Amino acid sequence: LPKPPLLPPPVPGLAPGLPPLPVPDPVPHPPKKPP
């Protein structure tokens, strides 16, 4: 059998028995200015 990938699946929920982990934004978005 092929070895499982070291990196977690891109879509949460594919790994059985593991809860989906939240992915925080790498860069905080600035507040949107009103038009």
Swiss-Prot record:
Ranges of biased composition (kind: Pro residues): 1-29
Q: Name the keywords, alphabetized.
A: Antibiotic, Antimicrobial, Fungicide, Glycoprotein, Hydroxylation, Plant defense
Q: Which residues form the signal peptide?
A: none
UniProt region (Disordered), positions on chain: 1-35
Output one GO BP term: killing of cells of another organism
Its biological purpose is as follows: Antimicrobial peptide. Inhibits elongation of hyphae in B.sorokiniana (IC(50)=3.8 uM) but has no effect on this process or on germination of conidia in a panel of other phytopathogenic fungi. At concentrations above 10 uM, has antibacterial activity.
Please state what the protein is called: Peptide ToHyp2
Species for this entry:
Taraxacum officinale
Taxonomic lineage of this organism? Eukaryota, Viridiplantae, Streptophyta, Embryophyta, Tracheophyta
